[in-house]
Amino acid sequence: MSASESSATSSVAPHDHGSSQVETSIPQLETLISHLVAAKRSLSSINHVWRANEIVTSARSALEESVVVSARTGFLRKGLNNQLRLLYSVRAEVEEVSVRGRSEFAGVLRSLDAADARLRKTLNLLRETIVHASFRPEGEEPKSLHDFVDERGVEELNSALKSAIDRTNAAQTELETSNCAFDDELQSIKEALGNYRAVTKMASSRTSASSSSSSASNASLPSMSGVPSMLHSLEMHAQEMANLLESLVRHFDLCVTAVKHTEGGGAAARSITGDMPAGMNVSGRGGPNIEEGINANLNAPLDPLSNSEYREMVNVLIKDAAEAEDVVMEIQDRIGEMESIYENILGQRDAVLAVYNATTSVFEHISSLASARLAGYIAQAHTFTRVWNDEHEHIQGGLSDLSDLNTLYDGFLEAYDGLILEVARRRHVRQRVEKVLRDAKHKLDQLYEEDVNARETFRVEQGDYLPSDIWPGIGREPMRIEFRRISGGTLKGVQDQHPDEDTAPPSDPKDVANHTTDENRDEGETIPALPKALVEEALARLKARNRQAT
């Protein structure tokens, strides 16, 4: 103890009885040292204060980041919705092209199948219809109507139609492949959207649980409305912790002063304050260097204190010592609350970032599709439309040609039945002509015989009286009438169509040795003798066609 301290002690020693009772209540140096050690230990709470400052700074940064990211997410989401609507609109239009093309193509194929079936049926009827032998040269192999038809036109038409169908099928296959790839792209986007919705739902539920704001119920995007109030709460906690730490520092300074003013306490104070808790000498973290202040207080010269001032200081020290532990506990409670709030803020920030990342993932899928492959999918639809329009025109032309061929061949069948009826009609007319000829010949023969007999009777009765040269014809037989068959020439209409064909010349009368009315002679045209059943069948078929036509 120094001389000045001794003189000071001795000067306050003689007091009355009351003063001595007060002096006996002053704690011993060991008690003051224990309070100093406890005060020094309480200063470790400065780490909580530093942590509180870090939390406030980080939370403010997280809030700023969340606001920026949330704004970006909202902007992207608006663009995303527009892009999705446009994308699905394009897919719907491409699908409409495909569906319409398939429907039209299927309808055309059905029409082609029906036309081809009709043509095949007609061709089969031509094969089944055998030309009656009386129409053909004697000894010729039997022929059907199909033998008179050149099917090369049908084959060429079918080949052209097959090529058009193959090209349409190829274009349709390419479109279907393109649409499947488009659907795969959309499925990938749907999966990204599913992840986006799951992340958004989780983020919204997290923010809803941490915020009582009505906007937290909006499940579209996580709400940040509760973060400013939480940041304000962190700032209030940090400020209050700084104030509490300041009170602990004042208590520590008071303990140091009390120990130094106590006999033998100077060395103890220097020894105790020689190794301050970690963080006391950290500068540049937003607060003063507390250790420098403590060292300045420790090394400062002692101001003289009266006994009453000393006792008052000690009483304040003891009172503060009883509350120091509560202050430390309050700092710990506040830092714990701040950590919880900070974790909540970081969780909301992470939720916003997760939604942003999920949004950008969907946007990247759409951007990649739109920039690299969407134009190809649209172009494929246009290519199919162009090919189908061209081939549709070709197929329609082929369909018309098939119908014309069927009409032609069906007309051939009908014409053959008409030919049978025409032959039957001509034979009937020939029979009538022959009957007229027979009747006329019979009457002419009768007239001839009557005339001969009359002439002979006249000659017998009057011949002796008439000179022979009075009329040379008096002794001639009567004129005879002969019928001659002349081969028919070409009809006038046929001559107009084929002017180069020579018509058959009429038979020379000198070539006819014996003219007769026999209908089986070869002079003139030859009319086949057709069975009655064949004629009746042809007539029945013609009537059936007429009923179908009406």
From Swiss-Prot:
<dbReference type="GO" id="GO:0030295">
    <property type="term" value="F:protein kinase activator activity"/>
</dbReference>
<feature type="compositionally biased region" description="Low complexity">
    <location>
        <begin position="1"/>
        <end position="13"/>
    </location>
</feature>
<comment type="similarity">
    <text>Belongs to the ATG17 family.</text>
</comment>
<feature type="compositionally biased region" description="Basic and acidic residues">
    <location>
        <begin position="508"/>
        <end position="519"/>
    </location>
</feature>
<keyword id="KW-0072">Autophagy</keyword>
<feature type="region of interest" description="Disordered">
    <location>
        <begin position="491"/>
        <end position="531"/>
    </location>
</feature>
<keyword id="KW-0175">Coiled coil</keyword>
<dbReference type="GO" id="GO:0000422">
    <property type="term" value="P:autophagy of mitochondrion"/>
</dbReference>
<keyword id="KW-0472">Membrane</keyword>
<dbReference type="GO" id="GO:1990316">
    <property type="term" value="C:Atg1/ULK1 kinase complex"/>
</dbReference>
<dbReference type="GO" id="GO:0060090">
    <property type="term" value="F:molecular adaptor activity"/>
</dbReference>
<keyword id="KW-0963">Cytoplasm</keyword>
<feature type="region of interest" description="Disordered">
    <location>
        <begin position="205"/>
        <end position="224"/>
    </location>
</feature>
<dbReference type="GO" id="GO:0034045">
    <property type="term" value="C:phagophore assembly site membrane"/>
</dbReference>
<comment type="function">
    <text>Autophagy-specific protein that functions in response to autophagy-inducing signals as a scaffold to recruit other ATG proteins to organize pre-autophagosomal structure (PAS) formation. Modulates the timing and magnitude of the autophagy response, such as the size of the sequestering vesicles. Plays particularly a role in pexophagy and nucleophagy.</text>
</comment>
<protein>
    <recommendedName>
        <fullName>Autophagy-related protein 17</fullName>
    </recommendedName>
</protein>
<feature type="region of interest" description="Disordered">
    <location>
        <begin position="1"/>
        <end position="23"/>
    </location>
</feature>
<dbReference type="GO" id="GO:0034727">
    <property type="term" value="P:piecemeal microautophagy of the nucleus"/>
</dbReference>
<feature type="coiled-coil region">
    <location>
        <begin position="315"/>
        <end position="344"/>
    </location>
</feature>
<dbReference type="InterPro" id="IPR045326">
    <property type="entry name" value="ATG17-like_dom"/>
</dbReference>
<dbReference type="Pfam" id="PF04108">
    <property type="entry name" value="ATG17_like"/>
</dbReference>
<dbReference type="InterPro" id="IPR007240">
    <property type="entry name" value="Atg17"/>
</dbReference>
<dbReference type="GO" id="GO:0000045">
    <property type="term" value="P:autophagosome assembly"/>
</dbReference>
<feature type="coiled-coil region">
    <location>
        <begin position="427"/>
        <end position="457"/>
    </location>
</feature>
